[in-house]
């Protein structure tokens, strides 16, 4: 599923440029993705679209502190929660977008959500909302933790 999400980000500048689900499924199949992966990714994106257009029940105040439920802590490890706090403190996210990211992370089934996958979720939520991204934040989202840990040889 995550490979498909990255593929969509790389191939469609804006979420609005994405074709309808049936046509997109055919294009993804032609690109070599498996049917079950396509279905899972399209279902996840459909959930993102549905929740993005419906207002959240309670919009957090900008100066509020986010406490995570036990299920959220189990799904979002400390590196993911720390990265989310970093983005919010940097001004890249508002509280409503943060909640949308958490909701979409909780909607991921069958995968351990490591920091790399979490960055893909964040990227897709911001892509769907067509929010402008600072180039340093975008670089941070596109950087894989394996690249960060790789030794620099000169």
Curated annotation (Swiss-Prot):
InterPro entries: Smg. Pfam families: DUF494 (PF04361). Transmembrane segments: none annotated. Belongs to the Smg family. PANTHER family: PROTEIN SMG (PTHR38692:SF1). This is Protein Smg homolog. It comes from Aromatoleum aromaticum (strain DSM 19018 / LMG 30748 / EbN1) (Azoarcus sp. (strain EbN1)).
